Amino acid sequence: GIECVAKRAEISTHALQGLYGELDRERLSDDLLRGVAFEAADATQYSSLDYSHLYMFDRVFSHCTLAALAKVLQRSSFYVMISSRKPQVWWDVGLHKVQPVAKMRFKTTGREGCTAFIYINKDFIPPGSEQRVPE
Protein backbone atom coordinates (compact mmCIF):
# COMPACT_ATOMS: atom_id res chain seq x y z
CA GLY A 1 0.00 0.00 0.00
CA ILE A 2 0.99 3.60 -0.44
CA GLU A 3 0.84 6.00 2.46
CA CYS A 4 1.53 9.70 2.01
CA VAL A 5 2.89 10.05 5.57
CA ALA A 6 6.10 8.10 6.29
CA LYS A 7 5.21 7.46 9.94
CA ARG A 8 1.89 5.89 8.95
CA ALA A 9 3.65 3.57 6.50
CA GLU A 10 5.97 2.55 9.34
CA ILE A 11 3.02 1.94 11.69
CA SER A 12 1.28 -0.14 9.01
CA THR A 13 4.40 -2.25 8.47
CA HIS A 14 4.66 -2.93 12.21
CA ALA A 15 0.97 -3.90 12.33
CA LEU A 16 1.54 -6.29 9.43
CA GLN A 17 4.45 -7.90 11.27
CA GLY A 18 2.16 -8.34 14.27
CA LEU A 19 -0.36 -10.20 12.11
CA TYR A 20 2.21 -12.87 11.33
CA GLY A 21 2.42 -13.61 15.06
CA GLU A 22 -1.36 -14.07 15.23
CA LEU A 23 -1.65 -16.52 12.32
CA ASP A 24 -2.22 -20.19 13.06
CA ARG A 25 0.72 -21.50 11.02
CA GLU A 26 -0.67 -25.04 10.92
CA ARG A 27 -3.96 -23.91 9.38
CA LEU A 28 -2.90 -21.02 7.16
CA SER A 29 -0.33 -20.65 4.44
CA ASP A 30 2.81 -18.67 5.18
CA ASP A 31 2.13 -16.92 1.87
CA LEU A 32 -1.18 -15.49 3.11
CA LEU A 33 0.21 -11.97 3.56
CA ARG A 34 3.13 -12.19 1.15
CA GLY A 35 1.67 -9.61 -1.24
CA VAL A 36 1.11 -7.00 1.47
CA ALA A 37 3.65 -4.19 1.80
CA PHE A 38 3.63 -0.49 2.62
CA GLU A 39 5.64 2.46 1.38
CA ALA A 40 5.68 6.19 1.93
CA ALA A 41 4.93 7.92 -1.37
CA ASP A 42 2.51 10.19 -3.22
CA ALA A 43 0.00 7.98 -5.04
CA THR A 44 -0.97 10.84 -7.36
CA GLN A 45 2.51 10.69 -8.89
CA TYR A 46 2.22 7.07 -10.07
CA SER A 47 1.31 6.19 -13.63
CA SER A 48 -1.08 3.53 -12.26
CA LEU A 49 -1.81 1.63 -9.05
CA ASP A 50 -1.77 -2.01 -10.04
CA TYR A 51 -2.94 -3.60 -6.83
CA SER A 52 -5.85 -6.05 -6.76
CA HIS A 53 -7.62 -4.26 -3.89
CA LEU A 54 -7.45 -0.59 -2.93
CA TYR A 55 -8.52 0.94 0.37
CA MET A 56 -8.37 4.69 0.79
CA PHE A 57 -9.04 6.67 3.91
CA ASP A 58 -9.85 9.58 1.64
CA ARG A 59 -12.19 11.61 3.83
CA VAL A 60 -9.49 14.24 4.27
CA PHE A 61 -8.45 14.42 0.60
CA SER A 62 -9.03 17.76 -1.11
CA HIS A 63 -10.91 18.03 -4.41
CA CYS A 64 -7.56 18.66 -6.12
CA THR A 65 -6.07 15.47 -4.63
CA LEU A 66 -9.15 13.43 -5.57
CA ALA A 67 -8.97 14.68 -9.16
CA ALA A 68 -5.26 13.83 -9.42
CA LEU A 69 -5.86 10.40 -7.89
CA ALA A 70 -8.82 9.76 -10.23
CA LYS A 71 -6.49 10.14 -13.24
CA VAL A 72 -4.17 7.50 -11.80
CA LEU A 73 -7.03 5.17 -10.84
CA GLN A 74 -8.60 5.48 -14.30
CA ARG A 75 -5.37 3.92 -15.67
CA SER A 76 -5.16 1.25 -12.94
CA SER A 77 -6.06 -2.44 -13.00
CA PHE A 78 -7.54 -2.95 -9.50
CA TYR A 79 -10.50 -5.29 -8.96
CA VAL A 80 -11.98 -3.72 -5.81
CA MET A 81 -11.76 -0.21 -4.39
CA ILE A 82 -12.99 0.89 -0.97
CA SER A 83 -13.44 4.59 -0.38
CA SER A 84 -15.29 6.90 1.99
CA ARG A 85 -16.38 8.99 -1.01
CA LYS A 86 -19.78 8.59 -2.66
CA PRO A 87 -19.93 7.44 -6.29
CA GLN A 88 -20.93 10.85 -7.63
CA VAL A 89 -17.80 12.40 -6.11
CA TRP A 90 -15.55 9.97 -7.99
CA TRP A 91 -17.51 10.29 -11.22
CA ASP A 92 -17.38 14.09 -10.99
CA VAL A 93 -13.56 14.06 -10.77
CA GLY A 94 -13.19 11.71 -13.75
CA LEU A 95 -13.09 8.20 -12.31
CA HIS A 96 -15.67 6.49 -14.51
CA LYS A 97 -14.51 2.89 -14.36
CA VAL A 98 -15.93 2.24 -10.87
CA GLN A 99 -19.31 0.69 -10.13
CA PRO A 100 -20.59 0.83 -6.54
CA VAL A 101 -21.74 -2.56 -5.24
CA ALA A 102 -22.13 -2.03 -1.48
CA LYS A 103 -21.61 0.31 1.42
CA MET A 104 -20.97 -0.34 5.08
CA ARG A 105 -20.57 1.58 8.31
CA PHE A 106 -17.41 1.28 10.40
CA LYS A 107 -15.67 3.04 13.26
CA THR A 108 -12.14 4.40 13.09
CA THR A 109 -9.64 3.72 15.84
CA GLY A 110 -10.67 7.15 17.15
CA ARG A 111 -14.27 5.80 17.41
CA GLU A 112 -15.53 8.06 14.64
CA GLY A 113 -18.37 6.62 12.55
CA CYS A 114 -17.73 6.42 8.79
CA THR A 115 -19.30 4.91 5.69
CA ALA A 116 -17.18 2.89 3.28
CA PHE A 117 -18.34 2.56 -0.32
CA ILE A 118 -17.24 -0.63 -2.08
CA TYR A 119 -16.65 -0.42 -5.81
CA ILE A 120 -15.66 -2.84 -8.52
CA ASN A 121 -13.65 -1.98 -11.60
CA LYS A 122 -16.02 -2.11 -14.59
CA ASP A 123 -13.12 -3.17 -16.82
CA PHE A 124 -13.41 -6.64 -15.23
CA ILE A 125 -17.18 -7.13 -15.48
CA PRO A 126 -17.73 -9.99 -17.95
CA PRO A 127 -19.47 -8.91 -21.17
CA GLY A 128 -23.22 -9.39 -21.06
CA SER A 129 -23.43 -9.48 -17.27
CA GLU A 130 -24.19 -5.81 -16.76
CA GLN A 131 -27.40 -5.23 -14.85
CA ARG A 132 -30.20 -4.40 -17.22
CA VAL A 133 -33.00 -1.98 -16.37
CA PRO A 134 -36.43 -3.45 -17.27
CA GLU A 135 -38.25 -1.50 -19.96
Please report, for each region that a protein language model flagged, where it lies by residue.
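A short pocket-lining beta-strand/turn micro-motif at the edge of beta-sheets
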Residues: 34, 50-52, 77-80
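A short SAM/SAH-binding and catalytic strip from SAM-dependent methyltransferases
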Residues: 44, 49-66
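Short linear motifs at secondary-structure transitions and domain/linker junctions
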Residues: 12, 29-34, 55-60, 90-96
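S-adenosyl-L-methionine
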Residues: 5-49
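Conserved SAM-binding loop
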Residues: 1-2
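A generic short-segment signal for beta-strand/edge and adjacent turn/coil regions
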Residues: 22-27, 50-53, 84-90
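C-terminal substrate-binding/active-site "lid" region of AdoMet-derived donor-dependent transferases
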Residues: 61-134
